Amino acid sequence: MASGDVLPRFYTVFLSCVSSNSLLIPRSYYEHLPRRLPKTAILTGTGGRVWKVAMMSKREQVYLARGWENFVADNELKDGEFLTFVFDGYKSYEVSIYGRGSCKETRAVVHVEEISDESESDNDSLGSLVDVTPMPAEENSDDTEGDNDSCDSVVDVTPMPVEEISDASDSDYY
């Protein structure tokens, strides 16, 4: 995509009775894309977590399939929540979740803690280790009571690298 292009996007309302195991991608969205959709997509949530999800074509419709149920569980999606998907033009979607109160929510946050070893010498060239652990959703609410600005324990994590489109074969796309 050219740098001035607007990234393709769509939205949906989550309903567990139809979207817990797979999510139908609107035909009006994918029919107008300049490229075919990949068979595997990378979903990046607002909390920094990343999910690999299979895209499946069935009866001339495209779904987010295998792996979608992990996204649903990790983000504790509830009926009536609004999801937006912004496609990078290759394989990745940035997914935002809007709760029933119409506000964007941060879920499935990646929690980073620095682990120091007391026995390490100050001259140790390896430095300290970092533990990256997902935080449970109830610990990462956007509650502003008390205005606790301790942002040092939660950080954005760069999404995992995705192979370039030029490296993909035609069988990787619909």
UniProtKB/Swiss-Prot annotation:
Keyword ATP-binding: no
DNA-binding region: 8-101
Keyword Ribosomal protein: no
Localization of this protein: Nucleus
SMART domains cross-referenced by the UniProt entry: B3 (SM01019)
Disordered: annotated span: 114-174
Residue ranges with Acidic residues bias: 139-150, 164-174
Cellular component GO terms, alphabetical: nucleus
CDD domains: B3_DNA
Protein name: B3 domain-containing protein At3g06220
GO function term, MF aspect, one: DNA binding
